[in-house]
Amino acid sequence: MERTAIYAGSFDPVTNGHLDILKRGLKLFDRIIVAILINPNKQYLFSVEERISMLEEVTKEIPNTEIDTFSGLLVDYAEQKQAHAILRGMRAVSDFEYEFQLALMNRRLNREVQTVFLMTGLRWIFTSSSIIKEAARFGGNIHGMVPELVERRIDKKMKDTGLYIPPKNNKKQKG
């Protein structure tokens, strides 16, 4: 029986931390479905199509990975895909309480689906999509935190949408 897990998230954008969890998860599972959550109540930087495109591109060399989208309950999606596990990455203790509550609710909704937590590698422990977007917005260097393709797309999106705010010159003016 193939061991399939669902790795769900918004992936807005995908980070090197996400890819770290995915690669390490493949040591535990035969196949991982990276499932992009479609939440109409949330505002995203990238469209679903853009997120699918980025994920497909950055995972093309990672075997046994499938990119998909879902809405609704994650455990229902897992059952539909015949997956028996949900893979979750945790950066810090602060993630644990929320993730633990989600895991308990998912377990209550479907006892056949287990949640597996992986700690993010130390190199990525501070990395989140939100922090990366905020840094990029103000001209911060995000090189190495996201794949190069994603870095270019963030830069372009920030400039094309007017979200980019150039750093201010901190030199005192004479006068």
Curated annotation (Swiss-Prot):
It comes from the Bacteria. Pfam families: CTP_transf_like (PF01467). It catalyses: (R)-4'-phosphopantetheine + ATP + H(+) = 3'-dephospho-CoA + diphosphate. It is found in: Cytoplasm. GO terms for biological process: coenzyme A biosynthetic process. One of its GO terms (molecular function) is ATP binding. Keywords: ATP-binding, Coenzyme A biosynthesis, Cytoplasm, Magnesium, Nucleotide-binding, Nucleotidyltransferase, Transferase. Its cofactor is Mg(2+). Reversibly transfers an adenylyl group from ATP to 4'-phosphopantetheine, yielding dephospho-CoA (dPCoA) and pyrophosphate. This is Phosphopantetheine adenylyltransferase. It comes from Desulfatibacillum aliphaticivorans.
